[in-house]
Each structure stands twice: as structure tokens, then as C-alpha cells.
Amino acid sequence: MDYRDSLNLPKTNFKMKANLAQREPMILKRWEKEGLYQMLQERAQDRPLFVLHDGPPYANGHIHLGHAFNKILKDIILRSKRASGFNAPYVPGWDCHGLPIEHNVDKELGEEKKKTIPILAKRAACRKYANKWIKTQKPEFKRLGVLGDWEDPYLTINYSYEAAIAREFNKFLLSGSVVRNRKPVYWCSTCTTALAEAEVEYHDHTSPSIYVKFPVIEDFSDVDPALAGDKTFVVIWTTTPWTLPSNTAVAFHPKFQYAAVAVGEETWVLAEDLVEKFMQEVGIEDYSIKSTFTAEKLENRNCRHPFMDRDSRLVFADYVTTEAGTGCVHTAPGHGADDYATGLRYGLEVLSPVDGDGIYTKEAGPYAGRQVPEVNSDIIADLAESGLLVFKKDINHSYPHCWRCRKPVMYRATPQWFISMENNDLRKKALKNIESVSWTPSWGMNRIHSMVESRPDWCLSRQRTWGVPLTVISCKDCGEVVKSEEVVAKIDELFLKEGADAWFSHPVEDFLPEGHVCTCGCATFIKEEDILDVWFDSGSSFAAVCELRDDLVAPADLYLEGSDQHRGWFQSSLITATGTRGYAPFKGVLTHGYVVDGQGKKMSKSVGNVVAPQEVIDEYGAEILRLWVSSEDYRDDVKVSKEILKQVSDSYRKIRNTIRYFLGNLNDFDPSKDRIAVSEMSELDRWALARFEELRAKITESYDKYEFHAINQSLNYFCGTTMSAFYLDIIKDRLYVEGTDSTIRRASQTVLYDILDGLLRLMSPVLSFTAADAWNALYSLGEKDSLEKSVFFADFPVAIDPQFDAEQEARWQRLIKIRSELTKALELARRDKVIGHSLEAEVLVKGEGELGEFIHAEWQHLREISIVSAMSEIEGAPEESAYVSEEVEGLVVSVKLAPGVKCDRCWIRSTTVGDSVEHPQLCSRCLAIVEDMDLEMDA
């Protein structure tokens, strides 16, 4: 007879095979049709607000895995905040101006057309290009399961946003923080524009490393009489020979000891601490130190430029070091920030004889018309010919490159517009505001503090087309800038109506009060043609988005981006808000590392180690990406590879199977009718509830601390070890075998229901697709009055009392340890073919002293959790083959085949099988259950 129909076997529509890649789009379609995000916002109107402000990705190209990691991390946080009782809106944004878009539009236009196309036509082409990629990226972000106001995102090309950018700039202008100077800035000769620090990337680059002699005009006899009449040279080191035409000084450290070194018939001056190292590098063995002295008497002396017809002054600078070179630093104020500062102190001429295309101008003498830095070889050859080149070799070092074209950049002195970090104490205020912000990881505060502390003035101007203009109007005759609230209001009015294009389509008169005249008497004015640094665009988002949208607020609770944004968006936002509002635009900042390959190397198409999110989604589904994000410690660089994703997929499968087991065993459970009170549950059931309460507390705390990898670890351990390998394994018998409505079965089902309810709430921020599907299955069981229709409407579970005290905790920890030893003994018996399955076994146990008393007192619990057919105590001396535990002192275990015959229904071996004539295959327990079922059917 087949007793299968008499068992309570699991049934569920929640499939074992997830088919995430096919299933997820259907779930997304349902969320969109229901208006899930809008419903969440409507339901949360009266809740406290939590604003995570989205740092806008660039509207160019398909999203990469770094984008996916960032967006999923944000979504996990926002979903967890909603489940914690907050109103947590998400307004995604896009950065739409700037060089990368203009660069690609130029390529589409071609060489000839890009030079002749009218400015408004080119701006229209750039706007069209940005919108094209927004339309491409939006569904790619939504496919990740990211909830947000995708129908009304913020775009930096929206007219209202462009007007806000101009307003913020004009606040700086009116306050006196905006200045125009000719000073060295990063310059890309390929893109022909100035660059901000945040637009510069560092890559390995090969440069010539040369040592050059500068002839001293007057001997050093007053420094040391021994040097009288010597043919003396100051030796400098540089890796940028092309800047030598701009040299106006050689810098010494005022406190260093310097040496006059005899080399042949010449005397060379360099730092004493570097003499030996220098001579070894240049291969000179025959030398002697004639004199040592401090630099005090060297200041304001002159040496002769090695090839230009002028002198170079000897000056002091604290940034001179003895880490490399000679301690005598080539100084060109037109080609370096430190050099420029030194030049200001000494009144040196700021020479920068290089045009925007990187071509030497006539001021470069014999090198005029030549390209930088190709001219390096000519300069080196000329130095060698004149006898002033000491040594030359090539070195590989980290060098600044343009973020767009990836070509090396230069420092070049040009007239530019800057936000002064000193005017209005901007630097001081920004540094103070940094200290008021919560930084995660904590080292982020020191990082951005040191950056702001040492950063130069912010170069705002860009010599390009696609961006918001520098809304500066100045007198044609005297150059005085018009600073007027009335002008600002007119700019704002036109920008709100027509966008920033208005600056280029309207004459200057449309922005000025009627009849406006300069203080010099001139009535002719000109508009600035440069555009703003794109970092000012995104840095103004707190004003353009958070302050203007009804669903947001400034300052935001959290900014979350990659750690590179300490010198990018975080810093531009901080400076902009500090300069116009006096406070930081964020209360907290969280940063994550870069996404790298499995070996920790940067992803590169040329190397072939790029993992595209689209490929991962097609193979595994977005859920696996979400689980991967939560499994990694985002504070460091995050590794990803096919092997890692497969491991994550395996981990997901275990969690899913646990959920499926729960649902399968709840198929006949109606929580409104079948629930059993905690007080009526067995200790095992209450132990399981205690473990879930422990998990709930740990996970909710981890969400609050943004420690998502800890959540992942907790979920995996709970599902795989606590539940599947222990509790679920033990209660399988009561779930399948006991009477359908028996108290012991309904009690365990109550535990399963409550744990699953809470588990789905806890995992929903991470495994959103799976939680949504499983919740629908749970919702169908009944109790609809108390259960939210969507898991995303449900808050995290509240604390429960499992009625499981400290004494019980201690006892069960000990029981589980003993059970672990019994399992080892069963494994050995299985290996030796004594038994097959543990249900075939009789376990004989002996405990010495107090252990024996404990085992005797907990006999029923130990019997229950061991999953064997029989258990008895060892009488007398144990057999030689018995297992002696090393973990539990005094414990001896012996295993043998249990007496009796295997019951066809519960598979437990029992001596009562065969006692019934009608059901000879059943044990006495199963017989009673089946007879009860027959009676119920008859009734």
C-alpha cells in the first residue's frame, strides 16, 4: 500500500529554478504598472524624511559595472530606510554638459563641420546626444531593480537646472569670490581647454629625466673663500625639459645644507644629502666636496639660463626636498602651482610661451612653432651640445592625463576665472564644515580635509561650447565686471524660459538695465565666452534639486559615490554650498571602492577583463548582481569575475531553496486559524524563534550602519546552517508525518510562517525580486488583514519574545555541541557501512559524571534533534569501536543498526512495524495517525 497521500508533503508554486533573467522583467513590469514607487511615496508622506541625493552619472555610453554597483548600493539603503519607517524618496539624475559629450559630437560632425557649425547648432547637437544616452541608460538602471522617480529625474540640461547653476555662480560673483587671474592651470592641448583637478587622471607615462647645469654669474667667494674664482654651476633636475624655456629661477630650501662639489675643473652646487646618490646615478666617481654651507647667502643671486638670453634668480622654497634630484629645483612660474606661488613672492615674470594647441610661441626663441612635448629631444640635444647636460635617462612615472582624451596634460599659465579659496574665508569655512559631516568610512574625513586644505583656487572657466556660460558681463573699455542684482534677475528670467542657450542667442543689452553705463563712462559691454567647469554643474545640485523639489530637502542626509569623488563631486558640492549657504550640502557621505577583476586589477577592454552588467543580467539575473553588491565590503575595491558571480549564484540558490522549503510546508497553513501560541510551543520551536530574533536584531543594526556584507553573511548562515542544516532537518518528521492539525505540526508551521514573514522583510532591500515573489506566495496563505499586500509596504519586523531565557540558551548550546559529536559518530558508522541513513541508526550514549546527568535530563531533546530511530544509554563499558569525543569531555558514542523494521510512512525503524494486520508496513505512531485520518474521512 502507498502511504504517500497520507503525508503532508510540501507544495508550492514558488519554483526551485529561479529563471531570474526571464522572471525579473515581468516583476519590473508589474511594479511599473502598479506605480509601486509612487504608492510607496504616498504611503510615507507623514514619515520622517531621509534624502539620499543621487550623484549624477554622465550621459554618455552604456552603464558599466561601477554604475550598477553604485545604483544598487543606493537602492539597498533607500529600501532599508523605507522598511525602517522613513519617507525615502529617490530622484535619479544625469550630468549632461561637458567635454566628453562635446568631444563625441565633434567626432560625429567631422573635422570641417565642427569648425564652421554655429554655436547654437552645436549646442543643440550636444543636447540631442545627451538625451539619446539618457534614454539608453534609464532602462539599464531600472533593470537593476532600482526604485525611483524615473519619470521625473533631474537633468543638468533642464532649463530650471541651468538657471540654478547661473544663480549659484552669480552669488559667488556678487560676493567677490570670483576672480580673473593669469596663473598656471591644467591644460589639455588636445581638447584645447583648461581642466580642474577632478578632471585629471594619473596614468603611467615615460618622460626624459635630465640633470642640467645653470652657470653661476658671480662666484661664491663670499659664501666660502675656497670657492673664489671657481667655474660654478647650480645643478637642477627635471622630467619636463619642454618647460625650461620658461625657467626664471632655481629654488633652494632655506634650511638645507648645500655642498660645492669639485668635478673636473668645475664646481657643482647641490644638496649635501644628495651628493652621493646623485654621483652614483650620473656615474661620476672622481669628485670631492670642497665646501658645505647653508642656503642663507644664496638668495637673490643670479645664474645664467642655459639657453635663453636672460638670468635665472636663486630663490627659497619650503617644498624643496631631498627625496630625489639635487635639492636645486627648476622653477617656471608659468608651468606649475608651486612655481607660481614662488614667483609671486619674488615678483618673477610668469612665462608660458605655449598656445592652446600646445605649440611654442615666439617667446620660446629657437623652439617657436614646435609642438610640446615633442620638442624635448631637441632641447636635450642642444643642452648636450652646449656642455650643460649632465645626464639623461628615461623614467616611467605617474603623470596627469586628461579625463576625456587620455592624453598627457600640461600646466599652462592663461587668463582664467577662479573661485578664490581665500576670499570670504572659503577654505577655512569648508574645512570646518567637513568636520560636521559623518564620513563612512571614517578615513574619508582626513582625505577630503587634506585635499581642501592644499587645493588651489578653483579654475571655473572652460574654453569650450557645451555647458552653462560664465555669466560675466564686463566693460569693453576698462574691463570692470558688472555686479548687479538686476542683471542676475534678468539672466535668471531668460534662462528659466530658454535655458543657457539664451546667453548665446541674446545680445548683451538684453541682460543689462536700460541705459546702463560703466563707472568709466563707457556704455559698451561684452559677455564672457567661456563656459563653466562641469563640476560646478553637479556641485550645484543641492540648490537645483534638493532645495527646489517638494519631495527633497537640503542638506541631504547622504551622498554616496566612489572614493574618487572626494576630489570630485563631494568637494565641488562642499565648496559651492559653503560659499553660498555657509554649510555642507550633506549630513553624511559614504564612499565605495572601484570595481576590479578577480585578481584586483583594473578592468580594461584591451586586457579583456571587463564584466558588463548586461551580460551578468542575461546569464544570472539582476538579483545576483544585487546579492554580489551586498556580499562585498564596499569600503575597499570590489572584486568581480565569473567565478565570484558563480559563488554568489550558489549562495543565492541556498537562500531560495530555504524560502521554498518554508513555503512548501505552509501550503495548508492558514495563519488566521492555525496559529499556535508561543507558550504552547516546544523548546525547539522557541529556540528557532530566538535565533530569528537574534538575526533580526543583527540585520537591522547592520542596515543602520551600512554594513551590508555583514547582512549577507548573517542571511547565509541563518538559511544554510541554523535553518536547513539544523531546525528544518529536525522538524521534517513532524511536518510530513504528524497529523495535519496536530499541535506539534501547527506550532512548527507557526514558527515557519513568522520567520518567513520576517525574513522576507529583512532581505527585501537586497533580494528585492525574490522577496516580492515569495511574499505573494505568503500573502496567498491568508491573514490578509494583517499582512501588507507588498513586501515593500511592510516595515522590518519588530522584536518578539520567543520565551527562551538565558538558562535555556545555555542548555541548548550544550545540546547542539553534543549533537554535533553524535553526527560525527553517525558519519563514521555510515563510512563503515553499519548504517545508510541516520534514521537506520540506534545511538548509544554514555556521559561521565555531570555530563551523564545532563544527558539524562535532556534525553527527549537530544533524542529529538539527533534524527535517529532509537537512542539508549550504554550500560557498562563501551565497545572498543565506540567514538570517544574530544570536543565534549566524557562523552562516548556507539552506533548500531536500530532494532525492528523500517516503517513505510515515516522511515523510522521500529519493533512495532507489522503489529497491525490491516497496515503491516506501519509503526504504531503512523498507524494511529492513519487511523485518525480514516475516521475523519468517514466522518
Swiss-Prot record:
Primary role: Catalyzes the attachment of isoleucine to tRNA(Ile). As IleRS can inadvertently accommodate and process structurally similar amino acids such as valine, to avoid such errors it has two additional distinct tRNA(Ile)-dependent editing activities. One activity is designated as 'pretransfer' editing and involves the hydrolysis of activated Val-AMP. The other activity is designated 'posttransfer' editing and involves deacylation of mischarged Val-tRNA(Ile).
UniProt subunit comment: Monomer.
Binding site for Zn(2+): 903, 906, 923, 926
Subcellular location: Cytoplasm
Chain positions recorded as ATP binding sites: 605
Family membership: Belongs to the class-I aminoacyl-tRNA synthetase family. IleS type 1 subfamily.
EC code: 6.1.1.5
UniProt xrefs under PANTHER family: ISOLEUCINE--TRNA LIGASE, MITOCHONDRIAL, SOLEUCYL-TRNA SYNTHETASE
Keywords noted in UniProt: Aminoacyl-tRNA synthetase, ATP-binding, Cytoplasm, Ligase, Metal-binding, Nucleotide-binding, Protein biosynthesis, Zinc
Protein name: Isoleucine--tRNA ligase
Motif placement: 'HIGH' region: 57-67
Binding site for L-isoleucyl-5'-AMP: 561
Comment block on domains: IleRS has two distinct active sites: one for aminoacylation and one for editing. The misactivated valine is translocated from the active site to the editing site, which sterically excludes the correctly activated isoleucine. The single editing site contains two valyl binding pockets, one specific for each substrate (Val-AMP or Val-tRNA(Ile)).
Cofactor info, note text: Binds 1 zinc ion per subunit.
Catalytic activity: tRNA(Ile) + L-isoleucine + ATP = L-isoleucyl-tRNA(Ile) + AMP + diphosphate
GO cellular component terms, A-Z: cytosol
GO MF, one annotated term: ATP binding
Motif ('KMSKS' region): 602-606
Needed co-factor(s): Zn(2+)
Entry's Gene Ontology BP terms: isoleucyl-tRNA aminoacylation
One Pfam family matching this protein: Anticodon_1
